[in-house]
Regions:
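Hydrophobic alpha-helical packing segments in soluble, helical-rich domains
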Residues: 29-46
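Short, charged amphipathic alpha-helical segments flanked by flexible coils
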Residues: 43-79
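Short, solvent-exposed positions on alpha-helices
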Residues: 28-32, 50, 71, 93
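Conserved NTP-handling cores and scaffolds of large molecular machines
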Residues: 41, 45, 63, 106-113
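Charged, alpha-helical scaffolding/interaction elements associated with membrane systems
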Residues: 23-24, 62, 86
Length: 134
């Protein structure tokens, strides 16, 4: 994924490590990395407010994610906690779902937005005057 903003460069190394863990069949490390990366993204956007849960709430309230994305991010938080605290071993499908959500958030915040701003849209032609009804 091509990250094109200076802000995104702050977590690009972590993103590379997540993909390295994925490639090397290390799903626990990848899920923990995704959780860490998403928290970094939220802190960059809304500032540091302590907990992932508080970051997520404020991130949503600031309009960065929809209700559906909010719920998905909450599940990713739980998956990260389950890996760390409950011995959760994500399947390839689990990891794929986590990566899909992460990539969607990053793309929406750092790729699509910039790409859309760079569209070369021609100006609208002037409107013809309406014929008088007389």
């Amino acid at each position: 994924m091509l990250l094109i903003s200076d802000e995104a460069s702050k977590f690009e190394d972590l993103l590379d490590e997540i993909y390295t863990a994925t490639t090397n069949n290390l799903p626990r490390l990848a899920v923990m990395g995704v959780r860490a990366l998403l928290e970094q993204v939220m802190i960059l956007k809304i500032g540091d407010h302590g907990s992932f849960g508080e970051h997520l709430k404020l991130f949503h309230e600031a309009g960065y994610v929809s209700v559906i994305q909010f719920d998905a991010l909450a599940r990713i938080l739980d998956a990260g906690h389950a890996v760390i605290h409950r011995g959760f071993a994500p399947t390839k499908g689990d990891l794929s779902a986590v990566l899909d959500v992460m990539e969607g958030i990053i793309a929406a915040l750092y790729v699509h937005d910039q790409n859309v701003k760079n569209l070369k849209i021609p100006e609208r032609p002037p409107r013809r005057p309406e014929p008088s009804k007389g």
